[in-house]
């Protein structure tokens, strides 16, 4: 009797595990680099942990975060476009922000994301309407790519390979994060935050991620060279934008707009060192990540950054 009950319990647990082990399905070829399924792709679907809960707003946001198959030619955006997108979200009363820390973190996510879609949301100087889901691109300087925290979108995974890679993107190279114990740490952090508050955040996701998109690989790119970031336009409502030159207490990492390129599907590096010499339309100035010549690889000591605090 005891053996039968034990076998029955094991059977139920196996069935429960199978039912909650989602698979991430990719129905397109989004990357210009070779890629293949990774371990997380067999155990965490597009909805993340929220796929099996009652938080519909969280599930919807997770699904957008994981949407690799944005369509159409990439529309070129500027930092000014990203700030205008943030202002437009405020005008429309789109909810965003969060309070507290896990496990008592409360997020104010939009229940209806259709208001964020391109139609009548924001028109670029070139006359293109863009919004959440649009395929876009921007040129800027990467600042210290690093793993994010454990997130609901990645089913709470804690391994670095299973986390998003967060990249601050700015129009001119921002100061590095000063090491702990630096006598001028407070001043240097303020200067760095002021620079980041004029930029945005862009992210690679772990699903089917090409090796050159890993944090360590991206940190090997010399920060002297601008990069071209291509991917989906996404409104990350889980945070707050900066308040002037200072990050909002709940806005880590610092950014001037909650609009991101997320997920990133292409990263290329410019052979020149100024934004004016790195037009996205000039294909002769761009190099794929895995084809970088030696002089475009960082030789300076790049300080390591820890993963960000867990969000969910």
Regions found by a protein language model. Give the residues of each.
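N-terminal secretory signal peptides that target proteins for export/translocation
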Residues: 1-2
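Bacterial N-terminal signal peptides
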Residues: 5-15
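Sec/Tat signal peptide C-region and signal peptidase I cleavage site
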Residues: 16-21
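OB-fold and OB-like single-stranded nucleic-acid-recognition modules
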Residues: 22-312
């Amino acid at each position: 009797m005891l053996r039968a009950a034990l076998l029955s319990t094991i059977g139920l647990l196996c069935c429960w595990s199978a039912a909650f082990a989602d698979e991430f399905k990719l129905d397109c070829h989004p990357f210009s680099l070779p890629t293949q399924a990774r371990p997380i792709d067999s155990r965490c679907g597009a909805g993340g942990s929220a796929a099996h809960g009652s938080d519909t707003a969280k599930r919807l946001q997770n699904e957008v975060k994981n949407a690799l198959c944005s369509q159409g030619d990439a529309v070129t955006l500027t930092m000014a476009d990203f700030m205008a997108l943030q202002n437009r979200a405020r005008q429309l009363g789109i909810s965003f922000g969060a309070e507290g820390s896990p496990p008592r973190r409360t997020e104010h996510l939009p229940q209806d994301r259709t208001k964020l879609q391109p139609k009548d949301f924001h028109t670029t100087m070139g006359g293109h309407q863009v919004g959440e889901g649009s395929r876009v691109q921007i040129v800027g300087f990467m600042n210290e790519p690093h793993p994010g925290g454990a997130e609901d979108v990645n089913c709470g995974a804690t391994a670095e390979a299973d986390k998003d890679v967060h990249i601050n993107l700015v129009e001119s190279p921002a100061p590095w994060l000063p090491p702990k114990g630096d006598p001028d740490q407070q001043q240097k952090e303020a200067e760095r935050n002021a620079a980041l508050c004029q930029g945005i955040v862009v992210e690679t996701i772990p699903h089917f991620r090409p090796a050159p998109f890993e944090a360590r690989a991206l940190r090997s790119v010399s920060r002297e060279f601008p990069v071209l970031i291509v991917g989906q336009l996404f409104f990350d409502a889980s945070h707050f934008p900066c308040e002037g030159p200072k990050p909002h207490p709940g806005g880590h990492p610092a950014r001037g707009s909650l609009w991101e390129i997320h997920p990133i599907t292409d990263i290329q590096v410019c052979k020149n060192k100024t934004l004016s010499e790195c037009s996205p339309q000039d294909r002769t100035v761009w190099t794929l990540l895995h084809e970088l010549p030696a002089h475009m690889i960082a030789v300076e000591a790049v300080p390591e950054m820890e993963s960000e605090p867990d969000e969910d």
